[in-house]
Amino acid sequence: MFTGTSSLKPPQTIWFSSKSIHNSRNGRLNDLHVRRGEGRAANRSAWMGAPPQHQVHEAPTGLHPKKAKTQDPRQSPLKTIWACAEELQPVFSEIDRLIAANVARTQRAFATARIGPHHFLGSTGYGHGDLGRGALDQIMADVMGMEAAAVRIQFVSGTHAIACALFGVLRPGDELLSVAGSPYDTLEEVIGVRGTPGSGSLAEHGVGYRVLPLAPGSGAIDWGALATAVKPETRMALLQRSCGYADRPTLSLEDIRRAVQVIKAQSPRVVVAVDNCYGEFTDTAEPGAVGADLCMGSLIKNPGGTLVPGGGYVAGKRHLVDAALARLTAPGIGSEAGAVNGETLRLMFQGLYAAPQTTGEALKGGRLAAAVMQGAGYGVTPASGACRPWSAITAIRLGSPHAMAAFASAVQASSPIGSYVTPTPGVTPGYADPVVFADGTFVAGSTSELGADGPIRPPYTIYCQGGTHWTLWVHVLQSVLTALAQLE
């Protein structure tokens, strides 16, 4: 259930589900047909469409921020935000140097592949012989420091790319070891920790699973436990580079290097795979440069440069990439098929080239959000200031579901798309807890554009990402501070 207003008419409240649209202003069905799936979160469903069978409902219940108060313009938080930005200029300068280094290595990869306009032609049908697709794979492999890569619009998400790698490599009797605590929520059903029986999880295919808990207190990898963690049946060790929805630091490349060494010392046959979502271009190298065998990610996150309309990638040793592609397509087809139209293919090239810059701006925006929210008395991870490793996700502990709703609503209202929609926590595929999402983005789910989301569970943390320029967060944070002040 969401509330929203149309900019074309006087303000009015609309409550709706997939079964009803109710206009509280005049009790009639409104001509603005905004709808959603049952129990789904705002930005994960269709907003516009023909109305279904109409039935008027009472106002929904749920988690909503308190009613807005009139804000005295003299109390605007803008001055505080700009003061934080001024103090962060040395940090921003460091990030600019990171951007420059990553632009250089990306351009070298493009030059090595000799990219020209003929690579943007695209393909149809089976997609056999697509020169552009093959060249893009070469660039991604180079950027990731890997032997091979597959960049495909056919991956529907980062979770899908990771799942293809897991199912491509693991066989009945093998064990998957999650090295840095539990993985991201959406992988739990892939693994079989929860979910609908009969969905074909790894567990249902006879693959074992074990979690290595994080070290108490620090939230870091438990190096002592990892030193003896590999068993004869352990076939893959999975490292999640970002914090995801966990209360822990981002893994550094040095963490990944050390983990590879510790794991391989016990068994060289273990495949070390890295969930690289939100990790691309946050350092001057990628997991392949420190010995990882595989890494996977989403094109609507960092490496798509906010331009790519969908897709994901797998990069690693050639036989492992081939195994993942056999899962994406079919054995015997693998990398030889997968049509993509020319316009989308050009955006995949252009987005990858833009990614160092857009990721750097997101890092700056995260540092600004951390400084402002820490100054307002909230706990943040990473803490304000320069951080190593750089993190594309800034976690802000708000302390209550109402504060999460207020924060998300302020972000959504400050966004270019769907600013009239108030996000409400709801059930979203892949997540065990209700999740609130605010990402009024041009590409659905492209949190690299700018977004904030989080599961409704203690300590009620919202996770901020993206921003094509850091000043977008100046505008957003002004709304956020105002909204949170109105809850007091």
Across the structure, where does each feature detected by a protein language model lie?
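Leucine-biased recognition of intrinsically disordered, low-complexity hydrophobic segments
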Residues: 8, 29-32, 63
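Cationic, low-complexity basic patches in intrinsically disordered or flexible, solvent-exposed regions
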Residues: 10, 54
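Conserved PLP-enzyme active-site core in the AAT-like
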Residues: 74-89, 96, 106-112, 116-119, ...
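Conserved C-terminal alpha-helix-loop-beta "cap" of PLP-dependent enzymes
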Residues: 374-488
